[in-house]
Amino acid sequence: MRVVVAMSGGVDSSVVAGLMHEAGHEVIGVTLQLYDHGAATGRKGACCAGQDIHDARNVADRLGIAHYVIDAEAAFRAAVIGDFAESYAEGRTPVPCVRCNQHLKFGDLLGLARDLGAEALATGHYVRREDGPEGAELHRAVDARRDQSWFLFATTRDQLAFSRFPLGTMPDKDAVRAEAARMNLPVAEKPDSQDICFVPSGTYADIVAKLRPDAAAPGEIVTEDGAVLDRHQGIARYTVGQAKRLGAASGHVVTRIDAARRRIVVGPRGAGGREVRIAEPNWLIDPPAAPFRASVKLRAGETPHPAEIDIARNLVTLDTPALAAPGQACVVYRESRVLGGGFIL
């Protein structure tokens, strides 16, 4: 079987390429160049640029597989970085990894894989794909610490059917590195990339300030009734649920962001609501007509909340109140399986 492997130059995707090659597949490695090659060379913590492209090529040479580099900088800036800055300027808290998966890895790259005559796209994501009675299913990884299922909720059923995730059954990262060492891959001890790959130094707020200076403009920190408690240095530095960097408003939590008035609104800790509305829903099940019970995660690393899901109304009703940050994902689970989700309004 011809398989395209998304190779970032890190240990995870390199091991995937090696495992697919050992399984007897015809492997084609593809690296999406997301930044200017020269400017990115040597940037610690970056991904998919400079040294990473060099590492991916070395791994491909070691395995004896084809390797191509695709210039995806313009698409990445438009779909990921542009959306990232715009969201913060509008008071939302974006998830750039979801947008990158949605538009580049399982959009453009998967389309390229099909154009190359491949029968599958394999990536280094820590998730499991299982074949169920209604087709391919998305499940949490065995390694709960590295599970990335929340970030793949926007993957369509067709994309999921075409995709393979060999690392989903790995017990931990040590096992992945052991595989890399066994295959004598040059990246076996390479450090992991950081969460936001395009912010290798400084802070994400610096990136937002360059693209949307209005998001870095100072403003007021106020209570729900409008009482001014302190000043802030830009709404891009805050998210709903945040309890740090509130100055004289210490002891409160951010309950919403009023982007039009450049105000950070705070309330007592424990504040929250039960209703969560979502946009851009994507479902990996045949949507039932009636509301149903499931659990949801409003942030990647949090404990799931029991809830009622009304697909027809794009409405999630939590059993207990919680703070939901606009722009983040509300992902619906039934045990280990991802049923779908959407972006929080």
Swiss-Prot record:
Catalyzes the 2-thiolation of uridine at the wobble position (U34) of tRNA, leading to the formation of s(2)U34. The record marks H125, Q328 as: Interaction with tRNA. Its EC number is 2.8.1.13. ATP binds at A6, M7, S8, G9, G10, V11, D12, S13, L32, G124. PANTHER family: MITOCHONDRIAL TRNA-SPECIFIC 2-THIOURIDYLASE 1, TRNA 5-METHYLAMINOMETHYL-2-THIOURIDYLATE -METHYLTRANSFERASE. This is tRNA-specific 2-thiouridylase MnmA. The active site is at C100, C197. Its main location: cytoplasm. It is found in: Cytoplasm. It comes from Acidiphilium cryptum (strain JF-5). InterPro entries: MnmA-like (IPR004506), MnmA-like_C (IPR046885), MnmA-like_central (IPR046884), MnmA-like_central_sf (IPR023382), Rossmann-like_a/b/a_fold (IPR014729). It catalyses: S-sulfanyl-L-cysteinyl-[protein] + uridine(34) in tRNA + AH2 + ATP = 2-thiouridine(34) in tRNA + L-cysteinyl-[protein] + A + AMP + diphosphate + H(+). Residues 146-148 are annotated as: Interaction with tRNA. Belongs to the MnmA/TRMU family. Keywords: ATP-binding, Cytoplasm, Disulfide bond, Nucleotide-binding, RNA-binding, Transferase, tRNA processing, tRNA-binding. The gene is mnmA. HAMAP family: tRNA_thiouridyl_MnmA.
